[in-house]
Amino acid sequence: GDVYKRQFIYRLFSYIDRGEFEQAGLWIAEHQASLIDKMALLKEQQQAEMSLYVALIHLGNGEYRKTRKRLSTTIGRGHLYSLPLFRTIRIVNVMIHYELGDVDYIQSEVRSIKREMSKNKGYNLKVESFLLKFLNYSFVDTNRKKRARIWESMAEEVHTLYADKYETQILRKFDFVAWVEAKIFEVPLSDILKREHASKSKWQRK
């Protein structure tokens, strides 16, 4: 029932938050037959939410083609565009193509997202603009010092995102800023998420 689905999603969410992608992969495998394979029976919004979290686990485990496949159905449903969840899915989809090195797709999708953003000004998110800006950078032949400078140049924007109540609703679903940091410094996403989770826990205990 619904409680079972919510528990499943909540567990996935907490694994992602802590950067525990391997354990999350095992959790998905355990529920493959009982839940994942029956996803088509769920309401559209529930399907989209579950697809997003399952896809993020694949992303964290470096299974980019699986991630792309998992999101492809939802991406085709443009009528959901104004929902924050769908916007998140669309950004994750561009991230996957970034991981796969699909430059042409990224450029065309970034243009398309920018067009949608200019049409839907009331729905625009700073985190979308932040990610689109990052996706325009090329890190080929960029040494560590240059990478660090790029990250420093983004610091103020990062601070603004974390301080904005509306933006943090999106970042709670998935910390896109952590993914950008992982890409810039060429470290595993799980390491950044574990560090962020530990600092959040410290803050919450004070």
Locate the predicted segments by residue.
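Active-site-proximal binding-pocket segments
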Residues: 64-65, 74-77, 83-92, 102-104
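C-terminal non-catalytic interaction modules
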Residues: 102-206
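Short, contiguous acidic/charged loop-to-helix segments that flank catalytic cores in large enzymes
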Residues: 41-45, 58, 79-85
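Amphipathic alpha-helical segments of tetratricopeptide repeats
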Residues: 28-40, 68-79, 112-122, 159
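Short, small-residue-biased leader/transition segments that mark boundaries at the very start
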Residues: 1-4
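"A position-specific structural signal for the A-helix of alpha-solenoid helical repeats
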Residues: 6-13, 46-56, 60, 88-92, ...
